[in-house]
Design a protein with these regions (language model features):
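Membrane-proximal extracellular/periplasmic loop immediately following the first transmembrane helix
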Residues: 37-105
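Short, strongly hydrophobic transmembrane alpha-helices
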Residues: 16-49
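Short acidic/polar micro-motifs at solvent-exposed secondary-structure junctions
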Residues: 62-75, 97-125, 135-149, 172-180, ...
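A short amphipathic helical element positioned immediately N-terminal to and/or at the very start
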Residues: 5-14
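Generic structural signal for small/hydrophobic residues in well-ordered secondary structure
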Residues: 13-16, 23, 44, 58-64, ...
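Mid-to-C-terminal secondary-structure elements
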Residues: 123-135, 149-206
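N-terminal hydrophobic targeting signals that begin at the initiator methionine
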Residues: 1-3
Length: 206
């Protein structure tokens, strides 16, 4: 019975070749487009899903101009004292971290010099709030002291090769010369994370 249905369907397709080809191609294109869109949506919705819930980002509304009717823009910025102040005044806030970023950050280790696309200066609480994987070192206290650094696997490979970088120093030559002690190694940041960095430096260094 089913075999006959297939025969009839095949005959109809063969009899109306052009019409059938248009339908089949249209169906194939539609299904392919649907799959691509669903994959894109799933990827976008996966961003930062590996982090613990109840994380909130403070934004700042800036007014462009002096008039109260001047246009406003919302930016992901806040004053550095805001975190400690809010924590002190609102017991509901369990923790906070500040992020100050820099890009094309030059780092030197002996005779090796590299430019890191993105680095963060963060509070020691950064890895208590965000669930980035620490492979080696103390993720909870590794950024507590000034001039401490935690670097990704990729950065460690570029600077130290196969050697253990824990306890070794790296130096930034910029407006000021700053030396950091490596206290930990982190897994490379997943692509589906909004926070992309190659190294974390102690906020207390600033």
């Amino acid at each position: 019975m089913i075999k006959n249905y297939f025969k009839i369907a095949w005959r109809n397709i063969w009899k109306n070749k052009v019409f059938s080809a248009i339908n089949i191609i249209g169906l194939a294109v539609g299904m392919a487009a649907f799959m691509v869109i669903m994959m894109f949506v799933a990827y976008e919705k996966s961003f930062d899903n590996f982090h613990t819930k109840n994380i909130y980002r403070l934004n700042e509304v800036q007014t462009i101009g002096q008039d109260e009717n001047s246009p406003k823009q919302k930016v992901a910025l806040s004053m550095f004292p805001m975190g400690p102040t809010l924590r002190a005044e609102f017991p509901e806030i369990k923790n906070f971290t500040r992020i100050n970023w820099d890009n094309k950050y030059q780092i030197t280790q002996k005779d090796k010099k590299i430019f890191l696309p993105q680095v963060f200066f963060v509070d020691s609480t950064f890895l208590k709030i965000f669930d980035f994987k620490v492979i080696k070192g103390d993720g909870l206290n590794g950024l507590l002291k000034p001039h401490s650094a935690m670097i990704t696997e990729e950065t460690a490979k570029k600077l130290f090769g196969d050697a253990d970088p824990i306890g070794k120093t790296i130096t930034h030559y910029g407006r000021d010369t700053t030396t950091f002690a490596v206290t930990g190694i982190m897994a490379n940041v997943p692509k589906n994370s909004q926070l992309q960095f190659d190294a974390l430096f102690s906020f207390n260094t600033i």
